[in-house]
Amino acid sequence: MPHSDAIAASRPLNDQHAHVRTTFMARLKPGAHLLNGQCGMGEDLCWLRAEGYVVTACEAVLADAKVASQQSGQAVRVCPLAKMHSVLPYDGIWLSRPLDSDVSTLVPLLQQLATLLKAGAPLCFPLPPSGKISLAQLQQLVTTSGIALQLAPMEAVSASTSDSSNQHATQYVMLLRGDHQAT
C-alpha cells in the first residue's frame, strides 16, 4: 500500500492557504524530499504527503507529534526545529507555525535552516500574527546577518483564519537558499 493511502481523506484541505501552497510547490520537483518543521498535529504533513513528496517531519511537543504521526501514518521526530540535522540537504522546508520573532533566536535559527537546504531550495513559513516582525524587517535582518537566504518573489499573501474578522490573518514569507554558505 502506498504511504499516501494512510492519510485520512475526510479532513478537508485548508484552502485559505492555497496560493501559498501552490507557490511553494511550483519550486519543487515531483517526489522532492521536504522538511515539515513545527508540524503541529500534522495537517500540513498530510497535505505534503498527499502531493507525493517525501517528508521528514519534526515537532517539539510530544503530544502533537503523536497526533501528527497518527494522522499521517508516518513517524514524526520529537525535536525542536533548532536541533534538526540532516546528512543530505532538503529540497524545501515548510514550517507549519511562525518562527520566534526575537532577533537573538531568529537569526541563528534561520542560519541553521539555511544549512539544511539545497541551493535554490525554498523555505516557507507564516509570519507571527502579532506583527512583531514585518516582511521588510525580516528582509533587512536576513541581508544584514549574512544568512544564506534571500526573499523569494511571492505576492503578499494573507490568509484569514476567520471569515468575520481579519485579526487572525497570517502572512506567509518564502526565502530561497542562496548558492553561498552562511557566514
Predicted regions and their residues:
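A short glycine-rich, Lys/Arg-flanked "PGG" loop and its adjoining helix->strand segment in the class I
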Residues: 107-119
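Conserved class I S-adenosyl-L-methionine
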Residues: 30-40
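A short acidic, Gly/Pro-enriched loop at the edge of an enzyme's catalytic core
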Residues: 82-93
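Class I SAM-dependent methyltransferase SAM/SAH-binding core
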Residues: 41-83
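Conserved alpha-helix/loop element of class I SAM-dependent methyltransferases that forms part
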Residues: 13-31
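A short SAM/SAH-binding and catalytic strip from SAM-dependent methyltransferases
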Residues: 91-105
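Core SAM-dependent methyltransferase catalytic element
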Residues: 158-183
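Conserved beta-strand signature within the Rossmann-like core of class I S-adenosyl-L-methionine
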Residues: 120-128
